[in-house]
From Swiss-Prot:
HAMAP family per the UniProt record, alphabetical: Ser_tRNA_synth_type1
Function noted in UniProt: Catalyzes the attachment of serine to tRNA(Ser). Is also able to aminoacylate tRNA(Sec) with serine, to form the misacylated tRNA L-seryl-tRNA(Sec), which will be further converted into selenocysteinyl-tRNA(Sec).
Record protein name field: Serine--tRNA ligase
Domain notes: Consists of two distinct domains, a catalytic core and a N-terminal extension that is involved in tRNA binding.
Pathway(s) served: Aminoacyl-tRNA biosynthesis; selenocysteinyl-tRNA(Sec) biosynthesis; L-seryl-tRNA(Sec) from L-serine and tRNA(Sec): step 1/1
Molecular-function annotations in GO: ATP binding; serine-tRNA ligase activity
Pfam families: Seryl_tRNA_N, tRNA-synt_2b
CDD domains found in the cross-reference section: SerRS_core
GO cellular-component term (any): cytoplasm
Family to which the UniProt record says this protein belongs: Belongs to the class-II aminoacyl-tRNA synthetase family. Type-1 seryl-tRNA synthetase subfamily.
Length: 419
């Protein structure tokens, strides 16, 4: 949820953010009206309760002659209190709905526009020049790494098996990510992949894209699409000690996405699938530290991409392509030779205080007063990285060279086709 102080002091900034996102600026006025109505309802109920308390004292002191009239007035006042409390509850409900409807306020400098309006911040390496390159699936099948056919037989479309060196390659990639994270002060966490509705909602994943989330209706739980969700919920309702700096976690988990809005897109291979694995960095910090921490997350992502030796670019995502929780997001996209384009391998989002406010995550400031924390997240490795590794490191004979940093984990320098 956005900070109401920002809404009250600078509603134009919130309207501008909504417009940049391509969302309804009228929601800002609706929230302002709901906030005013809620505060009025609270005040009215408080005043009536105070009046009721005074009336009760009068009844206790009243003479027998005065008592009947005072009791009748007290009963009438009790009815008014009940009505006022009911009105307050309705006002609170309307306010909460209006508050939840507004996306996070974007940070100054975020590009306006939609999916294609990103800004390229940096490009690293030259696109790999290959003659008649094979795509990752052809390579994966010839090397015995990926089995889509049996994945579909067992689970349906967009499922797969990673086998042999394919499994070792992913495991090695994740071990490298964990080593990178822990060397930089992250605590490794293997979180649950089923979460309660309030945690999924608190992170902003039950809004416009709720149809992308798998739900286990019998237990009223949701399968996570990223360990960002359980890690955001990890400290929900808590007051953190951030006096020694940010709290950084690296979550290793399986992730699940329905891809409901992706019909017909990336149907070949493992670029867009229903289940994959990921190591996700997650940070709690003071709001004033968030932008610097965002840059650090991006730096660790770039370090990982350097270790797997693929050409990539860094882009600043436009406001209309941001999730509701993100105030700014950077993506790192790797070159995919067979598609002759860059594809997303990482994203890192600065969610400012948006998620923490929903989830009740706070810290104590220098005066000991509880304040809302900021949260950030960023990919450190995921299954999709295998696409970039296989395609960029393929050799003319159909083999694939393993990046030097992964050789100790995979156990070989070259993967060769099976006969």
């Amino acid at each position: 949820m956005i900070d109401l102080k920002v809404l009250r002091e600078n509603p134009d900034a919130v309207r501008a953010s909504q417009l940049a996102r391509g969302e309804d600026p009228g929601l800002v006025d609706a929230l302002a009206d709901a906030d005013t109505a809620r505060r009025a309802a609270i005040s009215a109920a408080d005043n009536l309760r105070a009046e009721q308390k005074s009336a009760s004292r009068l009844v206790g002191k009243a003479s027998p002659e005065e008592r009947p009239a005072l009791l009748a007035a007290a009963k009438e006042l009790a009815d008014k209190v009940r009505a006022a409390e009911s009105a307050q509850a309705e006002a609170e409900k309307a306010y909460s709905a209006a508050h939840m409807a507004i996306s996070n306020v974007i940070i100054d400098g975020v590009p306006a526009g939609g999916e294609d309006d990103f800004v390229v911040l940096d490009t690293v390496g030259e696109p790999t020049a290959l003659t008649d390159p094979k795509d990752h699936l052809e390579l994966g099948e010839s090397l015995g790494l990926i089995d889509m056919e049996r994945g579909a037989k067992v689970s349906g479309s967009r499922f797969y098996f990673l086998t042999g060196f394919g499994a070792l390659l992913q495991l090695g990639l994740f071990q490298l990510a964990v080593r990178t994270a822990t060397e930089n002060g992250f605590t490794l966490v293997i979180p649950p992949v089923l979460v309660r509705p309030e945690i999924m909602s608190g992170t902003g994943f039950l809004g416009a894209h709720a149809d992308e989330v798998y739900r286990v209706e019998a237990d009223d739980l949701y399968l996570v699409g990223t360990s960002e969700v359980p890690l955001a919920g990890y400290h929900s309702g808590e007051i953190l000690d951030l006096s020694e700096g940010p709290k950084r976690y690296a979550g290793w988990s399986s992730c699940f996405r329905r891809e409901a809005g992706s019909y017909g897109k990336d149907t070949r291979g493992i670029i867009r699938v229903h289940q994959f694995d990921k190591v996700e960095g997650f940070v709690y910090c003071r709001p004033e530290e968030a932008e610097a921490e965002h840059d650090r997350l991006l730096g660790w992502q770039r370090q990982m991409l350097g270790l797997i030796e693929v050409p990539y670019r860094v882009i600043d995502i436009a406001a209309g392509d941001l999730g509701s929780s993100a105030a700014r997001k950077f993506d790192c996209e790797a070159w995919v030779p067979t598609q002759q384009t860059y594809r997303e391998l990482t994203s890192t989002s600065n969610c400012t205080t948006f998620q923490a406010r929903r989830l009740g995550v706070r810290y104590r400031d220098e005066n000991g007063k509880p304040q809302t924390a900021a949260t950030l997240n960023g990919t450190l490795a995921t299954t999709r990285w295998l696409v970039a590794i296989l395609e960029n490191h393929q050799q003319p004979d159909g083999s694939v060279r393993i990046p030097e940093a992964l050789v100790p984990y995979v156990g070989t320098e070259v993967l060769t086709p099976k006969n």
